[in-house]
């Protein structure tokens, strides 16, 4: 039986997309996938339609390693409208309460300090978390509120930028699973006036360089430029991609000699010198250090395969 024909290119890497405002993360993903003519694509944690900023798009084999970015920390710039609370905690929702803004600078500083460090957060009903197999926002749209457990998060840094009139601007560096909308809603309640997000931009994800972020408009311009020069668009698009193992850049590297990597790629744990005592590792092979997958140190100190790169014949 012949192997089914694959649709699109076998292109592997990560594009750091600057998601535009008003577009869902999935719509942005599909546009990038079409521009690159990629056979597979996936993002690494959705941004709300209102939000802009860094959305890493994994193409091809890089989709296998996107899960490691979900665990990474992120940095945001947010502007809150004080005195109004909405049902979604952002400007896309309906105003449900209005109150005067009467807090002092000292009260604001004290309230902000309660959100720094290790805290617990109850996720918004307007989130993609699931309850009994159904997303929370699906319940919310039906007017149903379901129980949610508080989840531990870490706010590594919360910077006060400005407070002018009924606007408050902050910069937040936080752990995975943090809902900025919920921080703003909770802050508004602490201040006694209510608040919601009117602007949100993701500035950074993990250690990705911010100067490598690109817009959809720039991608389209490169496609047009390639057509004018009568060259494949891939020649201009592909250099924009980060390496496919970049989602796992926080993990140590173990390099296997080619004699051992053959066994590893066939699903077998292997012994090698220089491996850590435990945990996940990025596995490369040979003198050129080609990435071949993720491994984990097993109980016998061997490198056991966890996620492998598949090389498709041309």
Swiss-Prot record:
Protein's UniProt keywords contain tRNA processing: yes
Residue positions binding substrate: 43, 76, 179, 200
Enzyme class: isomerase
Keywords associated with the record: Isomerase, tRNA processing
Catalysed transformations (reactions): uridine(55) in tRNA = pseudouridine(55) in tRNA
EC number per UniProt: 5.4.99.25
Pfam families, alphabetized: TruB-C_2 (PF09157), TruB_C_2 (PF16198), TruB_N (PF01509)
Single annotated GO MF: tRNA pseudouridine(55) synthase activity
Annotated SUPFAM superfamilies: Pseudouridine synthase, PUA domain-like
Active site: residue positions: 48 (nucleophile)
UniProt key word tRNA processing: yes
GO biological process: mRNA pseudouridine synthesis; tRNA pseudouridine synthesis
Chain's role: Responsible for synthesis of pseudouridine from uracil-55 in the psi GC loop of transfer RNAs.
Alphabetical list of HAMAP family matching this protein: TruB_bact
Similarity section: Belongs to the pseudouridine synthase TruB family. Type 1 subfamily.
Protein name: tRNA pseudouridine synthase B
Species in which this protein is naturally found: Shigella flexneri
Gene: truB
């Amino acid at each position: 039986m012949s192997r089914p024909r694959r649709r699109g290119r076998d292109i592997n890497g990560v594009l750091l997309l600057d998601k535009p405002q008003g577009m869902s993360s999935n719509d942005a993903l599909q546009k990038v996938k079409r521009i690159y003519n990629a056979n597979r694509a996936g993002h690494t944690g959705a941004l709300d339609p209102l939000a802009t900023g860094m959305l890493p798009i994994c193409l091809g084999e890089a989709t296998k390693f996107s899960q490691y970015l979900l665990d990474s920390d992120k940095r945001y710039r947010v502007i809150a409208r004080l005195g109004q609370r909405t049902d979604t905690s952002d400007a896309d929702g309906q105003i449900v309460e209005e109150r005067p803004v009467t807090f002092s600078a000292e009260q604001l500083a004290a309230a902000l300090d309660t959100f720094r460090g290790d805290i617990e957060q109850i996720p918004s009903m307007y989130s993609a978390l699931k309850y009994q197999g159904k997303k929370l926002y699906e319940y919310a749209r039906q007017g149903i509120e379901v129980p949610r457990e508080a989840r531990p998060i870490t706010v590594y840094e919360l910077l006060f930028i400005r407070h002018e009139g009924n606007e408050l601007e902050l910069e937040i560096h936080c752990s995975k699973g943090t809902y900025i909308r919920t921080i703003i809603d909770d802050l508004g309640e602490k201040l006694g006036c209510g608040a919601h997000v009117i602007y949100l931009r993701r500035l950074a994800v993990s250690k990705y360089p911010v100067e490598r972020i690109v817009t959809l408009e720039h991608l389209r311009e490169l496609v047009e430029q390639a057509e004018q020069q009568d060259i494949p668009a891939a020649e201009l698009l592909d250099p924009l991609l980060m390496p496919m193992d970049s989602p796992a850049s926080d993990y140590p590297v173990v390099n296997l000699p080619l004699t051992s990597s053959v066994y590893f790629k066939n699903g077998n744990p292997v012994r090698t010198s220089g491996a850590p005592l435990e945990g996940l590792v990025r596995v490369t092979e040979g003198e050129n250090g080609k990435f071949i997958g993720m491994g984990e140190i097993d109980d016998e100190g061997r490198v056991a395969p966890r996620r492998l790169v598949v090389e498709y014949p041309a």
